[in-house]
Amino acid sequence: MPRTDDDSWEITESVGATALGVAAARAAETESENPLISDPFARVFLDAAGDGMWNWFAAPNLPAQIAEAEPDLKPRMQGMVDYMAARTAFFDNFFLAATRAGVRQVVILAAGLDSRAWRLPFEDGTTVYELDQPRVLEFKATTLAEYGARPTCHLVSVPVDLRHDWPAALRQAGFDAHAPSAWSAEGLLPFLPAAAQQLLFERVQTLAAPGSRIAVEAPGPDFLDEAARERQRQTMQRVRDLMADLEPDRDIPDVQDLWYFEEREDVGDWLGRHGWDVTVTPAPELMARYDRRPPHDIEDATPQTRFVAAQRTERTRPDR
């Protein structure tokens, strides 16, 4: 279903379902023979959510009819698991480095089913602020509480739509804009219109004191490539048609219906112009760094995103 300006969702629908797909990829990596990351809670979320297309990533085998009709699908799915593993490791290492350097405020924008507040060994005194839709955060908190999980930090949930006045909600939750902070925007930007992305970073700029850090998964140069989008859409349509015959009650959303394909400023360029020291790593380079490589003989097997890491150095104080 196409997006609307004020849409909201449960964890099993629309944008929420994509968080379950990512959790399934983390579960698959965690349960693999040589995992790059460990997320013991990913499987917990899947079990709580029940059956859905997100379980494909975590399942050892596809239905035989689909595997035979779409032989590229399984290596594509493994490529996405490898991509998500590298992405997760990138943000894990970013946050751990920031807190080891003395940063004690962590802000996770559109936290979804991110479980870092429960699984990373944060330094003592670290506060993690998780921002997302109220029903998404409620599902996560309830699921982990029933499982008996406890945060490894001081966790503050901030139930707010990022299209609304989230800076006010963050401040009211205790965030100190005059102390350094570490921010993440992981799997977020394509779900925002270009104007909303611009506003997001402008707001971060008002809240991030000198010494703050940010990590971003940013759309790559092929994000607006219509030919690539059409190839991906046709592949998924064939899978939907096959699935409709096998399991007519299982819905497979088209993630492209949830994204905003609009021209937008390069994230690294924007941060560089606003007083941040920036490092940009293309996705293939990041995957190779972690010894994860996309299938070489399948076009568009993994996202051609860019991973941006930056630290604010200029001395302008954040707005009061």
From Swiss-Prot:
Keyword match Methyltransferase: yes
Domain of life the protein comes from: Bacteria
Natural source organism: Mycobacterium avium (strain 104)
PANTHER family: S-ADENOSYL-L-METHIONINE-DEPENDENT METHYLTRANSFERASE YKTD-RELATED, S-ADENOSYL-L-METHIONINE-DEPENDENT METHYLTRANSFERASES SUPERFAMILY PROTEIN
Gene Ontology molecular function terms on file: methyltransferase activity
Residues reported to bind S-adenosyl-L-methionine: D132, D161, L162
Protein's name according to its UniProt entry: Putative S-adenosyl-L-methionine-dependent methyltransferase MAV_4558
EC number of the protein: 2.1.1.-
Cross-referenced Pfam families: LCM (PF04072)
Record-level GO BP terms: methylation
